[in-house]
């Protein structure tokens, strides 16, 4: 999307500064010189997401790699969403203004259950098929983490990969694997099967879930040999060695 196209609608929405990017310490790169593009999506308003420490850490961590570019994405307010749909403007990354449907990864943080519908709405607004089974290509790969990922079943039909536990290490391992898959031309299924062998990674399509009559889960069983029977939560063993940013993006509006 061109910035001129965005500027035509900004006067008709509240708090337009949340949609333009370019804040102090936001990270800009040449998209022609990066090999992997990631959209870090917070399924809530800009002022909520910009106050979240986990997003700040992972945003900076991903961008430590020169050939990776992680951009921020937030759920637009109702007025902005209406105009985006009317003008056929897909959900975009704040740094480049490019549609996130063209990215390699679409990453969601699941901080609370009330955000689940926002996740689905953001996928739809991006022009990405909502259900995982309808996304057959390697990219975009839809990944979700955060505290609510420990109970993934309510949104298992929509997410390709869940990150269970602390994400600073496993997210990098997963992205490194994706880079190998992209280079060697793997299909989506092969990548998911290999990703399932990383500790803390749960791939719902590789498991069969059965339910009791009262709606509670009866069993979760792997449906392929690559999927472990039990997915272990990833924990950072030494917090003194964990990555922490030296500077944060300074928001344009009060948060």
Predicted feature residues:
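Structural motif at membrane-water interfaces of alpha-helical integral membrane proteins
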Residues: 38, 55-56, 70
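Histidine-anchored nucleotide/phosphate-binding helix
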Residues: 24-29, 54-64
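Helix-enriched interaction subdomains in cytosolic or periplasmic regions
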Residues: 1-15, 65
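N-terminal [4Fe-4S]-dependent radical SAM core
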Residues: 9-39, 46-47, 215-255
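A short, glycine/small-residue-rich beta-strand->loop->alpha-helix junction that serves as a flexible
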Residues: 45-53
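A short beta-strand-loop structural module common to alpha/beta enzyme folds
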Residues: 67-79
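Glycine-rich beta-alpha loop elements in corrinoid/cobalamin-binding modules
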Residues: 76-224
């Amino acid at each position: 999307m061109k910035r001129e196209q965005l500027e035509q609608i900004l006067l008709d929405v509240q708090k337009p500064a949340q949609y333009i990017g370019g804040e102090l310490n936001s990270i800009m790169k040449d998209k022609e010189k990066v090999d992997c593009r990631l959209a870090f999506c917070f399924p809530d308003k800009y002022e909520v997401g910009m106050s979240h420490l986990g997003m700040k850490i992972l945003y900076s961590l991903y961008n430590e790699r020169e050939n990776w570019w992680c951009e921020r994405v937030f759920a637009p307010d109702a007025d902005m969403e209406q105009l985006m749909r009317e003008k056929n403007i897909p959900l975009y990354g704040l740094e480049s203004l490019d549609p996130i449907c063209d990215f390699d990864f679409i990453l969601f943080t699941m901080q609370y259950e009330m955000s689940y519908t926002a996740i689905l709405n953001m996928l739809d607004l991006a022009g990405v098929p909502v259900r995982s089974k309808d996304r057959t290509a390697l990219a975009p790969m839809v990944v979700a983490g955060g505290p609510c990922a420990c109970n993934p079943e309510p949104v298992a039909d929509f997410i390709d990969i869940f990150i269970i536990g602390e994400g600073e290490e496993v997210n990098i391992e997963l992205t490194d694997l994706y880079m190998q898959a992209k280079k060697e031309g793997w299909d989506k299924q092969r990548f998911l099967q290999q990703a399932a062998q990383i500790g803390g990674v749960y791939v719902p399509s590789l498991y069969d879930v059965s339910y009791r009559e009262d709606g509670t889960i009866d069993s979760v069983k792997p449906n392929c040999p690559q999927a472990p029977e039990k997915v272990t939560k990833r924990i950072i063993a030494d917090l003194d060695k964990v990555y922490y940013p030296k500077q944060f993006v300074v928001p344009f509006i009060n948060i």
